A protein has these predicted regions:
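Short, Lys/Arg-rich, polar N-terminal cytosolic tail immediately upstream
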Residues: 1-22
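A structural signal for multi-pass alpha-helical bundles of membrane permease subunits
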Residues: 19-23, 27-296
């Protein structure tokens, strides 16, 4: 091969390399622009909620909206807390969330352990039927659950908010998949040493599956915090109102006029705990879900 051919070959390689660099750079720029646009679309409603909560009602109703309040009204937050009785709503929601989460964890752990380690007739068939129920929309159970709660006399009680949602097939499946990753040899060795199933579950499996359990706890608490339809149906009295239902009716006067800035302030207060939980514990959520999806 002549020197001229070598030079042309090097030039072609350089040209291809430059083109690849340009294409890769263009892809990166497009990717970052796309992510930036998506981030703005997602974050803008939260930004609008915050600035709206700092305005007065007259400025909020301006035909040309302002993107920052001319005068900051921090008093909206104090008014929101007292008007909506947020203290009681927080306590009610926390009580339902904590109790339902603890009971749900007990049921989920025992069920997942049974399907992952114990051997009994019809185990796979039963687990398959449970998974099949995940394809049924939860809304279909609303009427039957309501009738059952009414017949049991649980209307307007915390029991009606807790019991119907103690069992989650998705959480059982999630934890069972995590338990399946733990070598069965550990279980057999423990049985040889005379360890009971409950002791093995408590000493070995639960510590190893802790990230998934934390994920389930967070998701369950968030579900209780955001619940609206069911509490509205079965426990909408003042003594048992959840935080989402309390906000719905707290800021409308006798003329039907809603004080939107104060309502936005209340929504910001209610959203803050969930935002902080996700901000500081998101790694546990992702870790628990990813660990449960490795082995089927």
């Amino acid at each position: 091969m002549s020197k001229k051919d070598n030079v042309m070959k090097e030039q072609n390689i350089q040209t291809v390399s430059i083109r690849q660099t340009i294409v890769q750079g263009g892809v990166k720029v497009f990717t970052y622009l796309f992510l930036l646009v998506m981030a703005l679309i997602i974050l803008f409603p939260f930004y609008w909620m915050i600035i709206s909560s700092l305005k007065d009602l007259a400025e909020y109703k301006l035909s040309v909206p302002t993107f920052w309040p001319t005068k900051v009204h921090w008093s909206n937050y104090a008014e929101a807390f007292t008007t909506a009785n947020l203290g009681t709503l927080f306590l009610n929601t926390a009580y339902v969330g904590i109790v339902s989460t603890l009971l749900s964890l007990v049921i989920t752990v025992l069920s997942a352990f049974a399907f992952a380690r114990l051997e009994f007739k019809g185990k796979d068939t039963m687990f398959g039927l449970l998974l099949a129920t995940m394809m049924i929309p939860g809304e279909l159970f609303t009427i039957t659950n309501y009738m059952t709660i009414n017949q049991l006399g649980w209307m307007h009680t915390f029991t009606a908010l807790i019991v119907p949602f103690l069992v989650s097939v998705f959480y059982i499946y999630l934890l069972r998949q995590n338990f399946m990753q733990i070598p069965n040899e550990l279980y057999l060795a423990a049985k040889v040493d005379g360890t009971s199933d409950l002791k093995y579950l408590w000493k070995v499996m639960i510590p190893l599956a802790l990230p998934t359990l934390i994920s389930i706890t967070i998701l369950k608490m968030m579900g209780a915090w955001n619940s609206y339809i069911w509490p509205k149906l079965v426990a909408n009295d003042d003594a048992h109102q959840m935080i989402t239902n309390g906000l719905r009716n707290a800021f409308t006067d006798t003329s039907g006029q809603a004080n939107y800035p104060v309502q936005m302030a209340a929504v910001a207060i209610v959203s803050a705990p969930l935002f902080l939980v996700f901000l500081f514990l998101r790694k546990y959520i992702m870790s628990g879900v990813s660990r449960s999806g490795i082995k089927g």
